[in-house]
Regions:
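Fe-S-dependent hydro-lyases/dehydratases of central metabolism
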Residues: 44-247
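N-terminal non-cleavable signal-anchor helices
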Residues: 3, 21, 48-49
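Extreme N-terminal basic, low-complexity initiation segments
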Residues: 1-10
Length: 247
């Protein structure tokens, strides 16, 4: 059962024009949702599942990648986007800030052994700004991330994550700061993203988070992949084509 909660304001950053990063406030109705598991993304490449999993909760260890305005080129440099499929993009996530020209490691949270295997990414404001490349969330997913917690997101990046089944939730600056401190103090701490109760939990702490109603509804009902939805309606599409004389 879906329960309607209070109206909230969510800060997203639209990226309609290259180089423009102006804040926007989207007023949305919040919904409370029910529990399920995390699937692999289909994204129109390879086999598309006919029934997508409902995603309402993600848990695991987390890593904090500091800095506002982390753009998609930093997440996945453009030279790695020549691939025919998205397979293998994970190893190039944050490549230019993780690696020197000779391939040796730079100081970076993702290079620290204590954060290996982290499945939840924590970030600051305007995460995923810049170009709208869908390779960025693909690289994050294939690196192993299953959810992102940030102060705010670029609008197109947020949508691209949703269509991959990656929940993006927004927390206050202070709550992100406290969460990051807890993660850095104890990298083994489990972080839970609970879309049912709109909370993020870690240790004995629980903080409120928000998202957009459309993204949350898509995730919790298992309708976050448009191609899979289209394939589920194949019989209806075929019937309409016959009706119109196209088949």
């Amino acid at each position: 059962m879906l329960k309607t909660g209070k109206s909230d304001s969510i800060r997203l950053y639209p990226t309609k024009k290259a180089g423009v990063r102006r804040p926007s406030t989207l007023h949305t109705r919040m919904h409370r949702i029910s529990l399920a598991s995390c699937p692999a993304p289909s994204c129109g490449y390879g086999v598309v599942p006919m029934a997508l999993a409902k995603i309402t909760q993600v848990s695991g260890r987390a890593v904090f990648i500091p800095g506002a305005d982390i753009d998609t080129d930093r997440i996945i440099p453009a030279r790695f986007m020549k691939c025919v499929t998205f397979d293998g993009l994970g190893e190039f996530a944050f490549y230019d800030v993780r690696k020197n020209e000779d391939g040796t490691d730079k100081p970076h949270p993702l290079n620290e052994e204590r954060f290996k295997g982290a499945s939840i990414l924590v970030a600051n404001s305007n995460f995923g700004c810049g170009s709208s490349r869908e390779h960025a969330p693909q690289a994050l997913y294939r690196y192993g991330f299953r959810a992102v917690i940030a102060e705010s997101f670029a609008e197109i990046f947020f949508g691209n994550c949703t269509t991959l089944g990656i929940p993006c939730v927004i927390a206050t600056t202070e709550d992100v700061k406290d969460l990051a401190a807890a993660i850095n103090a104890d990298p083994t701490i489990e972080v839970g993203v609970d879309l049912v109760n709109e909370r993020v939990t870690y240790g004995d702490k629980s903080i409120p988070v928000t998202s957009t109603a459309s993204a949350r509804d898509a995730l919790i009902t298992g309708h976050w992949d448009a191609i899979a939805e289209l394939l589920e309606g194949k019989e209806a599409v075929d019937a309409k084509m016959k009706e119109l004389g196209w088949a």
